[in-house]
Amino acid sequence: MPDTPSPRDRLIVALDMATTDEAERLIDRLGDAASFYKIGYRLGYAGGLALAERLVKGGAKVFLDLKLHDIGNTVEEGVQSLARLGAHLLTVHAYPQTMRAAVRGRDSVPGSALRLLAVTVLTSYDDADAREAGYALSVSELVAIRALAAREIGIDGIVCAATEAAQVREIVGPDGLIVTPGIRPAGSDTGDQKRVVTPAAAIRAGVDYIVVGRPITAAADPRAVAQSIVAEIAAA
């Protein structure tokens, strides 16, 4: 990866709650055990962008998992706005027109540090889901096709399951970012994720950043869980 973040910075905590009050309470409980936060649809549409701006101003990093996908002009202008917000990572769906528009939008903001991530195949999908959606390809084949397109268009990294990380690394090279959701510490409930691995296994597979939600946010002691995951990353 182009930078070398600390083990703590490689953990992205998913703020998948309903209100910014809940999110800020969790952030306070985590303290310095975490420094990177993901904001998705649920919180994003409930004041999450304002929270993102506050977090950035406070020195934290923010991953906006908004999975943009629309006509080119709409995506381009949306990315411009989000780049000005100061977010560190932003997801877009891995469709060529969408990705090209996102790159144009990001590159039009002077000094932007925003990195764009292409969502290849959701980690809640498996081969049966791909067939149901009308694809005559396996998940791994779809991931490879979309990762190659993303690299050629100039996207900075890929969101994929850790099970596809080695395959994606061959495509994006050493400088491409790989971000993996669906991470579950050993013994955790997998929830609605189907292609899950532990933090250590993800790091060993070549993942740059891992995204962890419920195992931290639903824990009785989220700080202790976050610290345990960071230690696992450091030891991997």
UniProtKB/Swiss-Prot annotation:
Transmembrane segments: none
Pathway(s) annotated for this protein in UniProt: Pyrimidine metabolism; UMP biosynthesis via de novo pathway; UMP from orotate: step 2/2
Quaternary context: Homodimer.
Record EC number: 4.1.1.23
GO biological process annotation, one example: 'de novo' UMP biosynthetic process
Gene3D superfamilies, sorted: Aldolase class I
Catalytic reactions on record: orotidine 5'-phosphate + H(+) = UMP + CO2
Active site: 67 (proton donor)
Enzyme class of the recorded protein, top EC level: lyase
GO cellular component: cytosol
Keyword field contains Lyase: yes
Record protein name field: Orotidine 5'-phosphate decarboxylase
Homology family: Belongs to the OMP decarboxylase family. Type 1 subfamily.
The species this protein was found in: Methylobacterium nodulans (strain LMG 21967 / CNCM I-2342 / ORS 2060)
InterPro entries to which the protein is assigned, alphabetical: Aldolase_TIM, OMPdecase, OMPdecase_AS, OMPdecase_bac, OMPdeCOase_dom, RibuloseP-bd_barrel
